[in-house]
Amino acid sequence: MARSKVIAIGASAGGVDALHDLVAKLPEAFPASVLIVLHIGAHRSELPAILNAAGPVPAKHATNYEQISSGQIYVAPPDHHMIVSHGRLRLLRTPKENWARPAIDPLFRSVAEAYGPNAIGVVLTGYLNDGSLGLGEIKRRGGIAIVQDPDDAAYPEMPGSAAAHVALDYRVALSRMPGLLVELVNGKAGKEAAMPNKSSQPEAEGVSPTIDGEKFDRPLALTCPECGGALLKSQNGTIIKFDCHIGHSYTGEVLASAQFDEMERVMRAAVRILNERAEFCLEMAEQARLQEPDAAGPWEAASKQALDRAYKLRVLVEQDWLMPETFGAMSGRPSRISG
């Protein structure tokens, strides 16, 4: 008996509407299981209720060690990665990947390993490039790689990145996605040949060693924005990845965004501390004036200096910053983010 298909879907910004529209057109008794990761972080999620109201295929938040069944939609719950292991769903609070938990890549990797050619990976609308590495792994193991046409997506970066880095089987508008999935699970649609599982070429002398098929370089003079651990660079196909010893993982674009967030946090904290110093120095000036009028001068000067530097630093934080995202960098048109 042929093994049933498993469809793994990843979405981020704009994903609620996209998932609603996709699920609304799936038929009752859909002969496959659907596993969904939406970037929701630790926030409460009403996605299963939204999907249940949209169409006939039942949806629920996954539970740990739950058996996977056909005709069911499983949604990763808040603040947990969802993966597949031995036909069951596992929910893990392991380190964030691509600045997200739940993240798409862990699900896609596990589905690729567990289901091989019976896996179907779908990347929908979203920012940055979570899902690109995992979709490549699904393709490498003989599965089917699909993205929402970036021109059709509310936020084209995520499907665009997957399209740029993975040999896709299908790139379709969202309106065509339900019909395509029905054809695929019923075996009525063809697909391109999958990428080879391993390169048959011997490793050249001087080439970086590999771990699970990824080439690793020496540790970098960069630290993890999440925990401060040293980062190790690796390359999977055309995608550069950075991992720390704790397990936090980033693509290059996500690391750039995470670095910016951390930089802004530290600079705003410095502004706050400078303002606090200015206030403290004024209080000390008042105390000094009670004992010796001339003694207040240095404290007042220190307060003025702190306020002046807090202002300059705040102006710096609130200036426009270049944020070379995937497509902006590729096209030579870097985008800007204003403070």
Which residues make up each language-model segment?
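Conserved acid/base catalytic micro-environments in cytosolic active-site loops
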Residues: M1-E286, Q305-D308, L313-M323, R333-I337
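Acidic, serine/threonine/proline-rich low-complexity intrinsically disordered regions
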Residues: Q287-Q291
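Short, charged, amphipathic alpha-helical segments
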Residues: P293-Q305, G328
